[in-house]
Swiss-Prot record:
Belongs to the neurotoxin 08 (Shiva) family. 01 (omega toxin) subfamily. The keyword Disulfide bond applies. Residues 23-45 form a propeptide. It comes from the Eukaryota. InterPro entries: Omega-atracotox (IPR009415). Inhibits insect, but not mammalian, voltage-gated calcium channels (Cav). The record marks P57, N74, R82 as: Critical for insecticidal activity. The presence of a 'disulfide through disulfide knot' structurally defines this protein as a knottin. It is found in: Secreted. This is Omega-hexatoxin-Hmo1c. Expressed by the venom gland. Disulfide bonds join C51-C65, C58-C69, C64-C83. GO terms for cellular component: extracellular region.
Amino acid sequence: MNTATGVIALLVLATVIGFIEAENTRADLQGGFESYEGEAAEKIFRRSPVCTRTDQPCPYDQDCCSGSCTLKKNENGNLVKRCD
């Protein structure tokens, strides 16, 4: 076997291994957070905001901490929804 054949064989092997790894990754992504266990999952969900704070934009009618969202003028004079 010469050098060119060896290089081609290594490239084919790397490609096959890449496809196997891609299949494993796809299975993990389809499961969502099922692959996370215990503390790792808690850290992910702990960082997510519970409510939108005062004077922050509230698009898509998200829940504000105060419980209300009203139209207010921004620095450009445009009306935007903001949490009270």
